[in-house]
Amino acid sequence: KPRILCEMLEITDETWRNAVEGYLNTQRFYVLVEPEHFDIALGIYEKLRREKKAYGVGLINSGKLEEYDIAPAGSLATVVESKSIYAKRYVNMVLGKVHMCKRVDELKQYPVSITPNCMRYQNHVASAIRPEIYTTPFIGKNAFKVQYEQALQKKEDLNRQKIECKDRMTHMEVTLQWLEWDDDTDVKYRITIVSELK
């Protein structure tokens, strides 16, 4: 049965959640099948591509990952677990080369490294991963719960903004009433009143 990688993983140290989510980025959504089903899945994917129904989805060839049974010490792969040997091997391959650094000044000591707050160093370039990539979690069984809580918070924030906007509109409507006039003689008086309404 095809599975999405992020649903098969758990992060064991929340300090490094953002780094794992951010570094994997779109790879979190790659599809994983058992090695014996890869060719069939690839054929289906190719058919969908020809029909212009699927693009940009990664299909992991799990049969080629035998050498990645162990997560290298100090690597980002050490904080990710999976019940699937194939998912764990893939994570070991991708995150096993990424060294965890607690401070930014340690980054350049390794070819590929990352801090908990997502400052990444790779190919002799330091860069910050955009927060929108990792702010919403997708990895692990609690990811949907966190997404739901984030959605509720966003709804609450939007409702508060809506109330604030309505209050401002009401205030503006009152102010505009004072600007309406029939004769030019009222202009000076009304401008004085408007300034007092602030």
Predicted regions located by residue number:
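Extended alpha-helical coiled-coil "stalk/arm" regions
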Residues: 156-198
